[in-house]
């Protein structure tokens, strides 16, 4: 796997980069140009990694007004001119100490930063939350769509599978692409087309690096009568709670009321 990151460069390397840019812009080639009053000079350092730090490549790019004029590529090991303006950058290859410093940046900067990132971003893991819901309420033997929502996980690698009665379902599975939440976590929806039969059990199984074992969430197909009974039971339970609450309120108010005849003075 290849990976790329921007350099976090120690002060010494920044100083070297600024020195190179200033020298480039003060050469005869640069002095012959008609520089505008306002211009932009940039240094961009990038590290490229393959299989961790098995292979590391560092590239330092020197840019004037968004045009790269010179670079140092660790695979080449020397400064190279990209345009006429950067022609004199190759003179820096004669300064052996400075050249060795640039070559050493692969270890001192790239590999160093990789280890630092590995302890924070690269090893960060957040377990996913998994829920199942039908797209609509339908009776048995009617076409429907089950949605497995997998949310708030990191890193992005994830595997979501559907099962019907312990048998994996591959036909009728549709998935969204990974969705970035903007807080370094992801979410994904994996849908399964179904025609549920009485007693069917559908399972969404999720595998992720943050998990010791897969998460499994079940959804059971129910007949209309079973759903009605369940809803009736829930409704009865809620009504019971309401009447119980009203009874307690009435009793509480009754306890606060007068318990004997009012004082005689209040009758006149």
From Swiss-Prot:
Keywords: Adaptive immunity, Cell membrane, Disulfide bond, Endoplasmic reticulum, Endosome, Glycoprotein, Golgi apparatus, Immunity, Lysosome, Membrane, MHC II, Signal, Transmembrane, Transmembrane helix. Residues 127-229 are annotated as: Beta-2. Its main location: membrane. Restricted to skin Langerhans cells (at protein level). Residues 1-32 form the signal peptide. Gene3D superfamilies: Class II Histocompatibility Antigen, M Beta Chain, Chain B, domain 1, Immunoglobulins. It holds the Pfam family MHC_II_beta. Glycans are attached at residue 51. Residues 128-216 form the Ig-like C1-type domain. Residues 33-229 are extracellular. One of its GO terms (cellular component) is MHC class II protein complex. It is a single-pass type I membrane protein. Residues 251-268 are cytoplasmic. The chain crosses the membrane at residues 230-250. One of its GO terms (molecular function) is MHC class II receptor activity. InterPro entries: Ig-like_dom, Ig-like_dom_sf, Ig-like_fold, Ig/MHC_CS, Ig_C1-set, MHC/Immunoglobulin, MHC_I/II-like_Ag-recog, MHC_II_a/b_N. It comes from the Eukaryota. Disulfide bonds join 47-110, 148-204. Heterodimer of an alpha and a beta subunit; also referred as MHC class II molecule. Dimer formation with HLA-DQA2, but not with HLA-DQA1, is required for efficient exit from the endoplasmic reticulum (ER). In the ER, forms a heterononamer; 3 MHC class II molecules bind to a CD74 homotrimer (also known as invariant chain or HLA class II histocompatibility antigen gamma chain). In the endosomal/lysosomal system; CD74 undergoes sequential degradation by various proteases; leaving a small fragment termed CLIP on each MHC class II molecule. Binds peptides derived from antigens that access the endocytic route of antigen presenting cells (APC) and presents them on the cell surface for recognition by the CD4 T-cells. The peptide binding cleft accommodates peptides of 10-30 residues. The peptides presented by MHC class II molecules are generated mostly by degradation of proteins that access the endocytic route, where they are processed by lysosomal proteases and other hydrolases. This is HLA class II histocompatibility antigen, DQ beta 2 chain. The gene is HLA-DQB2.
